[in-house]
Amino acid sequence: MRIENSFIPVHGVGETTERRLWENGVTHWDEFDGSVVGSTLAARIETFIEEGRAHLERGDVSPFAEALPAASRWRCYENVSDETCFLDIETTGLDASCEDVTTVSLYRGGETKTFVKDRDLTAARLERELDESALLVTFNGQRFDVPFLETCFDVSVDVPHVDLMYPCKKLGLDGGLKAIEREIGIDRDMPELSGRDAVRLWHEYESGDEGSLETLVEYNRADTRNMEPLMEHVADRLHEDVFEAATAGD
C-alpha cells in the first residue's frame, strides 16, 4: 500500500470515510471522485492530493507521517523503502540523563553501519546519516531510542518515523522485538541476547575484552537488519487487512 492509496491524512477524513471512498472505487488519488463525499471535504481532499504529489516528487513523506496515527505510519514505507533507515541503539541503562549510548547501528539499502562510543559515535555522524534517510524505522524507538539520542547528543531527530511496536500491536503481535521475530519466523544468526547482556558486554569491553565489543556490535546490527523483514511483514499484513479487505468487491 502506498501513500497515494491513503486519504486519512486529510483533516476530517477518518477510517470510515476512507473505507467508503475505497468501496466506491476511489482506491487511488488518480481516481478521486468528489461526489462520494460532501463538497467541502472534496475540496480539502483535492488540495491534499495536489500538495501531496509535490511532496512525493521530492521523496518527502514527512507531512503524511505527521498526519497519520502511529499505528498507520507503515503506509509511508513502500514509497521510500530504498531510503529507509532501520535504527537500533544499545545503552548502559534506561535513564538518558545519566547513562550512555554505547553503539548505534543503522541499516539502509542493504548496508549496515555501526558507530561506537569513544570511537566514531558523534552527533555529526548521526545527523549526517539521518539526513540521508527519507524514513526512520525503529522498534520502541518513539519512547526509547529517539529520546535517548536527542538527550545524549543534543540532536533533533526530525526524520519521519515508523515505530514498529504500534502496527505490530494492531496485528496482535505483542512483546519485544525478538519475541515477535520468533512468532513470525525471522531467524537470527547468533544466540539471543538481552538488553541486560548488552550492558554487561559493554562493561567487559571497557575492562579490556575486545571480543565482548564484537559480540555487542553484532547483536546491535542483527536488531537493525531484522527490522527490515519485520517491516515488510507488517506492511503486507496490514495491506491485506486494511486495504484489500475494503476493496475486495471492486
What are the functions of these language-model segments?
Residues 105-106, 110-185:
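Conserved DEDDh/DEDDy metal-dependent 3′-5′ exonuclease domain
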Residues 1-81:
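N-terminal accessory regions of nucleic-acid-interacting proteins
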Residues 28, 122, 144-145, 223-226:
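Short phosphate-engaging motifs
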Residues 88-90, 145, 163, 223:
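Acidic active-site catalytic centers that drive phospho-/nucleotidyl reactions
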Residues 183-250:
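Acidic, Mg2+-coordinating catalytic module of metal-dependent nucleases/exonucleases
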Residues 65-135:
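Conserved RNase H-like, two-metal-ion catalytic cores of nucleic-acid enzymes
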Residues 22, 96-98, 148, 171, ...:
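Short, function-defining helix-loop hinge/capping sites that tune catalysis or transport
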